[in-house]
């Protein structure tokens, strides 16, 4: 085994773990009368001293033999080893030092040494820090974080670049145990963090607003479980990781102080790599298949008109819903229009009705939309997060709870066209007929 960088298979002697500027002794599985300490694998801090880390790599080897008149006089030999930072498939847990040599930082970062933190602390007052020379896919990540103020400290994993990664972040608050968005997971794709498209991955959590919190993340394929502090069952269950990448780097983001990070590659606690079943799988009322237009800029204050819908020859493509009936425009286009203007795109589908009738429709969207049936406007509304009174339930996120309206249908084929505009984070649409009897939705 290899725990915290200490080789635990040594016979009858203590291994001295050399990490940055502190050292801790580790007992071996066997007892030697010349080496004090219990016969189990546990760290015992006997001495602290300055020692530079000059060698890296797997079991870098013996660096130096150290003998002390007092603390070490009963020890025959103490051999100094370095931890192995690169994570290989099937490797044992690795402790990550919070030292400048291991992290690439942006903005305001401090590396600190305090009693009781053998591997140091990293304080991110703002910005973030990327762990060097690490590629992470599946496994367990554990760390402690002491939050600073009311920011959103967290960890990004499977980071491909600045625009694509998975993100878990905290929203410490005095009412955090009851605050629905205290802990959140969201993917970032094409440079857009999609927190407002996945409200099902935001939850209450037993976080301490002031003080240390222990976070344990288990990642397996398309799933993730998150445990907070002493929780024995997951605080947050992510049935499907929604990012576009399956492996990549690790990044911590502030504000917060981080310590005691341990990565256990491929340790997934039996968590299946397959995504959980879509809760709306088999729902025959979801409008799942659409045609999507190209995007254009829509000046603020202007409404979309039916006669502005792009012609059939102007680059339409088919698109199907993701989980929960979400049409994810951000995954297609990112945030294509800079500045104050909104990006607008059109979606259209055909609903065939057995007779002339009306149907109740549940609809979710971000941020503004206009719905036309056979060329006539039947519904328009806004779901603006930045204007609190204009937020639709649940709290400005995209959900079928956002709104409802009556859909008028003629006998035969009916064209349903939706113009949807956005300039704030996730860009998406959900449409569901409460009762699909007597209608036929477009097939894939």
Where are these regions (language model features)?
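Aromatic-lined ligand-binding clefts that engage carbohydrates, nucleic acids, or primary amines
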Residues: 358-372, 416
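Carbohydrate-binding surfaces in secreted/extracellular proteins
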Residues: 208-237, 368-378
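Extracellular/secretory pathway-exposed regions associated with glycan biology
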Residues: 262-354, 424-428, 433-444
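Secretory/extracellular carbohydrate-interaction modules
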Residues: 126-190, 296
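Short carbohydrate-recognition loop motifs
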Residues: 110-127, 139
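Short, aromatic/His-centered strand-loop micro-motif at the edge of beta-sheets
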Residues: 191-214
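Short, solvent-exposed beta-strand-to-loop segments that form ligand-recognition rims
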Residues: 229-247, 378-391
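Ligand-recognition surfaces built from glycine- and aromatic
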Residues: 242-280, 399-408, 415, 431, ...
């Amino acid at each position: 085994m290899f725990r915290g960088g200490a080789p635990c298979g040594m016979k009858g002697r203590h291994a001295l773990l050399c990490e940055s500027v502190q050292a801790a002794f580790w007992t071996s599985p066997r007892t030697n009368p010349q080496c004090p300490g219990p016969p189990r694998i546990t760290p015992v801090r006997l001495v602290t001293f300055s020692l530079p880390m000059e060698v890296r790599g797997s079991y870098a080897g013996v660096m130096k033999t150290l003998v002390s008149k007092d603390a070490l006089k009963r020890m025959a030999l103490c051999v100094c080893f370095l931890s192995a930072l690169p994570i290989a498939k099937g490797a044992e847990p690795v402790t990550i030092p919070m030292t400048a040599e291991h992290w690439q930082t942006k903005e305001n970062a401090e590396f600190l040494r305090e009693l009781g933190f053998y591997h140091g602390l990293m304080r991110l007052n703002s910005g973030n820090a990327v762990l060097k020379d690490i590629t992470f896919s599946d496994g367990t990540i554990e760390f402690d974080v002491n939050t600073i103020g009311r920011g959103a400290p967290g960890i990004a994993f499977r980071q491909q670049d600045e625009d694509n990664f998975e993100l878990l972040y905290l929203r410490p608050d005095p009412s955090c145990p009851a605050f629905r968005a205290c802990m959140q997971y969201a993917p970032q794709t094409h440079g857009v963090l999609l927190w407002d498209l996945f409200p099902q991955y935001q939850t209450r959590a037993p976080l301490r607003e002031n003080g240390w919190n222990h976070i344990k993340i288990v990642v397996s394929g398309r799933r993730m479980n998150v445990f907070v502090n002493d929780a024995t069952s997951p605080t947050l269950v992510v049935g499907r990781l929604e990012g576009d990448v399956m492996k990549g780097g690790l990044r911590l983001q502030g504000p917060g102080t981080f310590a005691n990070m341990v990565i256990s590659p491929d340790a997934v606690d039996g968590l299946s790599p397959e995504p959980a079943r879509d809760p709306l799988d088999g729902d025959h009322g979801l409008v799942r298949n659409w045609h999507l237009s190209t995007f254009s800029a829509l000046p603020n204050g202007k409404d979309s008109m039916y006669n502005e819908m792009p012609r059939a020859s102007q680059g339409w493509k088919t698109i199907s819903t993701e989980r929960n009936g979400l049409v994810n425009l951000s995954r297609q286009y990112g945030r294509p229009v800079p500045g104050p203007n909104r990006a607008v795109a059109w979606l259209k589908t055909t609903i065939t009705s057995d007779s002339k009738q009306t149907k109740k429709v549940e609809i979710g969207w971000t941020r503004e939309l206009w719905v036309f049936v056979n060329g006539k406007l039947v519904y328009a509304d806004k779901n603006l997060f930045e204007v609190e009174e204009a937020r639709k339930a649940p709290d400005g996120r995209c959900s079928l709870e956002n709104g409802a309206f009556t859909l008028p249908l003629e006998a035969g084929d009916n064209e349903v066209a939706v113009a949807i505009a956005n300039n704030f984070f996730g860009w998406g649409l959900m449409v569901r007929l409460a009762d699909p009897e007597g209608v036929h939705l477009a097939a894939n």
